[in-house]
Amino acid sequence: MKIKAGFIVREVAGTFLAIATGELSKTYHGSLTLNSSAKFLFDNMQEDTTKEELVKKLVEYYDDLDEATALSAVEDFVNKLEEANLLD
């Protein structure tokens, strides 16, 4: 799974916004507000990956994060992207 192409990400007042552009903006009219962990996942989903790979990367990136919490975060983020039809 990976995020559909066509987003640009900008930092605004300490928050990251992923804004749909080009062809994607014809079907997705919103933007995604990303905290630091969501931005990390978003960046790592530009290429095809799995939930398991994302959990592993998240645990490696955040020293104090346990696998169960990382899995919950990944599943929540992926579910939101699926609901918005933003995954390839």
Locate predicted features.
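Long, charge-rich, low-complexity alpha-helical segments
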Residues: 30-88
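Acidic, low-complexity/disordered tracts enriched in E/D and polar residues
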Residues: 1-46
